[in-house]
Amino acid sequence: MPESQNQVTNSQTLVIDAEKFEFEALEQQNGFATVVKFKVENPDVRPGDVLLILSGGDINFHGFIGKIEDGWGIAMDRNGSQLAAVVH
């Protein structure tokens, strides 16, 4: 009989307006940020959650948060990022 595991399988989506999103582009492709580092201000945000950056009704970035360390998160959107890779 398998042991029961105490793992939460639900993830949440962190939605941020593109105008207010401050980040560092760790990787980029064709001028768009594909891996970003950003300050995590909500203590409920966990690795595995989704980061969604919106500009009006347009999705600029949609990716999983892979790591959170010392209050900073790293998220990846390697396929569809429209987030300009400029210093914010």
Where are these regions (language model features)?
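N-terminal helix initiation/capping motif
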Residues: 1-21
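Short coil-to-beta transition motif at edge beta-strands of beta-rich domains
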Residues: 40-55
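Short alpha-helix capping/helix-loop boundary micro-motifs
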Residues: 33-41
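Short, charged beta-turn/beta-strand-edge "cap" motif at the junction between a beta-strand
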Residues: 56-60
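Short, basic/aromatic beta-hairpin or loop at an interaction surface
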Residues: 16-33
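Short beta-strand-centered aromatic/proline hotspots
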Residues: 61-68
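Short, solvent-exposed secondary-structure boundary/capping segments
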Residues: 70-81
